[in-house]
């Protein structure tokens, strides 16, 4: 009987703790959306048309192939006003379903790049050519935050 009382008491304490922890959980007014890889580019002076020609041809072809194969959701090119010399003036944004999908599809994405752009040598050659017209100042991963409707 003593063991039964201890078990019932332990069960009651466990239920109480679980109840308190559930009650204590914060009700967040948002949920995670898609993930974005954002490249910050500085187009060199006088090279805007040359870089836009690359983006409208090879870069766009690769992005469309990645989208068709389900590796990405979308992509965007955002021109921004640079305020100081050497500051980035273009963002290349690639949208993924989530970070896990982005990581899981790396091999598939590389295969698409090989198919569309070419082998490693061709990709390196293109990167060197583009280095003459633009500079990659950095990349960031971002996660979209979807705000929930305000509850009444």
Residues covered by each model-derived region:
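Bacterial N-terminal signal peptides
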Residues: 9-19
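Immediate post-signal-peptide N-terminus of mature secreted/exported proteins
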Residues: 25-50
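Extracellular/periplasmic catalytic domains that process cell-envelope and extracellular macromolecules
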Residues: 29-33, 83-88, 132
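Structural recognition of the beta-strand scaffold that forms the well-ordered cores
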Residues: 37-40, 74-76, 91-94
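Short, solvent-exposed mixed-charge patches
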Residues: 151-152
């Amino acid at each position: 009987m003593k063991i039964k009382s201890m078990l019932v008491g332990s069960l009651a304490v466990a239920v109480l703790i679980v109840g308190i922890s559930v009650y204590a959980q914060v009700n967040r007014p948002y949920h995670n959306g898609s993930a974005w890889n954002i490249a910050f580019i500085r187009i060199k002076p006088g090279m805007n048309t040359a870089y836009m020609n690359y983006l409208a041809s090879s870069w766009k072809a690769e992005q469309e192939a990645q989208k068709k194969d389900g590796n990405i959701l979308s992509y965007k090119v955002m021109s921004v006003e640079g305020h100081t010399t050497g500051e980035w003036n273009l963002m290349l944004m690639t949208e993924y379903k989530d970070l896990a999908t982005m990581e899981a599809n790396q091999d598939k994405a590389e295969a698409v790049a090989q198919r569309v752009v070419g082998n490693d040598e061709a990709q390196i050659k293109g990167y060197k050519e583009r280095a003459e017209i633009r500079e990659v100042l950095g990349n960031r991963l971002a996660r979209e935050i979807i705000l929930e409707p305000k509850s009444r």
